[in-house]
Amino acid sequence: MAAGGAGGNSGKTYSFKVVLLGEGCVGKTSLVLRYCENKFNDKHITTLQASFLTKKLNITGRRVNLAIWDTAGQERFHALGPIYYRDSNGAILVYDITDEDSFQKVKNWVKELRKMLGNEICLCIVGNKIDLDKDRHVSVEEAESYAESVGAKHYHTSAKLNKGIEELFLDLCKRMMETAQAEERLKGNGASQSASSRRGVQIVDDEPQATPAGGCCSSG
């Protein structure tokens, strides 16, 4: 179900599915753990197939429930990607700024997502590990130019230093809310059900509660 108009959404709860994609060792799991639990482990954490975390937020008086899927980056798990990104409202495509190949693999994911889900999914391209900027192999200009060319937004993050992560997820949530609200307006005008509606955006009337902006998070 899609969202209502911007003027009457103060009592709504939005439920969104977000998937993280990218090569192994780019730091996807570290980003999610830093965002949800404010934890960081210097040791590489290998994700097998996928892990799942949730985050609850209050954004401009509207409650948002995020279901965040962290997928495995190993090539042997690539074929499982569609299982996790179908029905997603947003995708975070992560590369390591010190690894040019990981950036090229992001381009493959973008092509696949656009082919399977169309243009309505909100895409974020993330250059992670900016704490290693002296070893950078992907230029800021190249990455930002590419993101703009495919209708995505680009972000720089460091899970180690806890930089850029809150901004990334907050901005993505706002974009998904805007998309959902636009779909609800179309629905109110008698338009046929859209792709994002079919992807399962859930917005329900709710009694607003005083939830801190940071929200809470639990593993599932």
Predicted segments, located by residue:
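Switch II (G3) loop of P-loop NTPases
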Residues: 64-77
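Conserved Switch II/interswitch segment of TRAFAC-class P-loop GTPases
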Residues: 88-107, 117-120, 131-137
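Conserved catalytic network of the ASCE P-loop NTPase/AAA+ motor domain
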Residues: 58-61, 83-87, 114-119
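Switch I (effector-binding) loop of TRAFAC-class P-loop GTPase G-domains
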Residues: 37-63
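Conserved P-loop small GTPase signature centered on TRAFAC-class small GTPases
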Residues: 1-25, 63, 120-125, 129-220
